[in-house]
């Protein structure tokens, strides 16, 4: 089961963005596999001490990107295939390059 416990409100990055990044890094790195279930929104919100709507926002964005599939009353499932893994790797690399360039300015 995935552990979101290392995410922090004190990080300065909105928690929904941290959740997005954590799941995307897991998909890109292969540590979160196709078919794996994500913890429920309530479990993650209780663990992080945030409103369930915050977790819902992250899960909704992941679903819009085609990385997870959600059904009412059921856990969300990762549906990222090799093409999605490759796409996520590219996105993360582009973000890293942007951040590095911004830090150099």
Residue map of PLM features:
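Alpha-helical DNA-recognition elements
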Residues: 25, 57, 61
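A short alpha-helical element within helix-turn-helix/winged-helix DNA-binding domains
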Residues: 37-48, 62
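Extreme N-terminal segment that seeds HTH/winged-HTH DNA-binding domains in transcriptional regulators
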Residues: 1-37, 43, 84, 88-105
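Short, Lys/Arg-rich nucleic-acid/phosphate-binding segment
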Residues: 37-38, 67-78, 82-83
């Amino acid at each position: 089961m995935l552990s979101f416990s290392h995410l922090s409100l004190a990080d300065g990055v909105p928690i929904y963005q941290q959740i997005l990044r954590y799941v995307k890094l897991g998909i890109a790195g292969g540590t979160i596999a196709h078919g794996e279930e994500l913890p429920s929104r309530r479990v993650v919100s209780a663990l992080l001490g945030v409103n369930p709507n915050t977790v819902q926002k992250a899960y909704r964005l992941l679903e819009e990107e085609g990385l997870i599939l959600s059904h009412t009353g059921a856990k969300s499932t990762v549906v990222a295939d090799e093409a999605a893994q490759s796409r996520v790797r590219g996105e993360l690399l582009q973000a890293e390059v942007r951040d590095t360039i911004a830090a150099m300015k």
